[in-house]
């Protein structure tokens, strides 16, 4: 199983939100580049970065920070948040990003998504963020009428190879991942799944590993030290 330490960017800083609420932010590190270096130092093999400002604005607003992170570490970096054009995708690849995560665009601009998948294949990941089972977009501010299962099936038909699934109600809560929704997703599509939201303990990670989930994104648990990065990397390596 792949472990993705998370860095959420807001106004150039590394923050964590509670259940996706922008008003409930906690600054975890004033210097996201330093945080990325720390994660790499403790053994991380890849990083997951979200441009929260970009997710709301519809364009990358932390590109310079993302570029600095890519230059500062030697591990692959995947980035999501506000990426809604091929130009934006190409710009991220040009500064060293390894994979790009499309969210809102996957729901509202299928032509762009299809072009991106055709051009970049497995380098394009789709992020599906769900609130009460329905897909949320534009920085989780809007909730659509499409279920996360239906969108995942559409993504599979288009040729998307990896999905990041987030249950918003679990995000930043340390309440454990939504196993039920993940199991349903596994039964519905044959795409690689990266679980995000609520992971609080080594036991949570083991449970996801036992389900053969491809990867897990860990944020608050690393910052709050309820999960030790070196330990979880060792555990998943042995499983």
Curated annotation (Swiss-Prot):
<dbReference type="InterPro" id="IPR023016">
    <property type="entry name" value="Isoase_HisA-like_bact"/>
</dbReference>
<dbReference type="InterPro" id="IPR013785">
    <property type="entry name" value="Aldolase_TIM"/>
</dbReference>
<comment type="pathway">
    <text>Amino-acid biosynthesis; L-histidine biosynthesis; L-histidine from 5-phospho-alpha-D-ribose 1-diphosphate: step 4/9.</text>
</comment>
<dbReference type="InterPro" id="IPR044524">
    <property type="entry name" value="Isoase_HisA-like"/>
</dbReference>
<dbReference type="InterPro" id="IPR006062">
    <property type="entry name" value="His_biosynth"/>
</dbReference>
<dbReference type="GO" id="GO:0000105">
    <property type="term" value="P:L-histidine biosynthetic process"/>
</dbReference>
<dbReference type="Pfam" id="PF00977">
    <property type="entry name" value="His_biosynth"/>
</dbReference>
<protein>
    <recommendedName>
        <fullName>1-(5-phosphoribosyl)-5-[(5-phosphoribosylamino)methylideneamino] imidazole-4-carboxamide isomerase</fullName>
        <ecNumber>5.3.1.16</ecNumber>
    </recommendedName>
</protein>
<dbReference type="GO" id="GO:0003949">
    <property type="term" value="F:1-(5-phosphoribosyl)-5-[(5-phosphoribosylamino)methylideneamino]imidazole-4-carboxamide isomerase activity"/>
</dbReference>
<keyword id="KW-0963">Cytoplasm</keyword>
<keyword id="KW-0028">Amino-acid biosynthesis</keyword>
<dbReference type="InterPro" id="IPR006063">
    <property type="entry name" value="HisA_bact_arch"/>
</dbReference>
<comment type="similarity">
    <text>Belongs to the HisA/HisF family.</text>
</comment>
<feature type="active site" description="Proton donor">
    <location>
        <position position="129"/>
    </location>
</feature>
<dbReference type="GO" id="GO:0000162">
    <property type="term" value="P:L-tryptophan biosynthetic process"/>
</dbReference>
<feature type="active site" description="Proton acceptor">
    <location>
        <position position="8"/>
    </location>
</feature>
<keyword id="KW-0413">Isomerase</keyword>
<keyword id="KW-0368">Histidine biosynthesis</keyword>
<dbReference type="GO" id="GO:0005737">
    <property type="term" value="C:cytoplasm"/>
</dbReference>
<dbReference type="InterPro" id="IPR011060">
    <property type="entry name" value="RibuloseP-bd_barrel"/>
</dbReference>
């Amino acid at each position: 199983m792949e472990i993705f330490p998370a860095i959420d960017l807001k106004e150039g800083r590394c923050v964590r939100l509670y259940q996706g609420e922008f008003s409930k932010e906690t600054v975890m590190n004033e210097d996201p580049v330093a945080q990325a270096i720390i994660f790499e130092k403790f053994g991380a093999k890849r990083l997951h970065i979200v441009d929260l400002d970009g997710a709301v604005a519809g364009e990358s607003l932390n590109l310079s920070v993302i570029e600095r992170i890519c230059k500062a570490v030697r591990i692959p970096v995947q980035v999501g948040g506000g990426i809604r054009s091929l130009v934006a995708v190409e710009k991220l690849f040009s500064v060293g990003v390894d994979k790009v995560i499309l969210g809102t665009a996957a729901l509202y601009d299928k032509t762009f998504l299809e072009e991106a998948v055709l051009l970049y294949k497995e380098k394009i990941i789709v992020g599906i963020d769900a609130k009460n089972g329905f897909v949320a977009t534009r920085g989780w501010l809007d909730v659509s009428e499409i279920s996360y299962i239906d969108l995942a099936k559409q993504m599979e038909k288009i040729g998307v190879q990896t999905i990041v699934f987030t249950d918003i109600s679990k995000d930043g809560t340390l309440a454990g991942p939504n196993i039920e929704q993940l199991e349903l997703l596994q039964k519905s599509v044959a795409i690689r799944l990266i679980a995000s939201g609520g992971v609080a303990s080594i036991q949570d990670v083991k449970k996801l590993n036992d389900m053969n989930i491809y990867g897990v994104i860990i944020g608050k648990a690393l910052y709050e030290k309820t999960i030790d990065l070196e330990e979880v990397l060792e555990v998943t390596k042995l499983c």
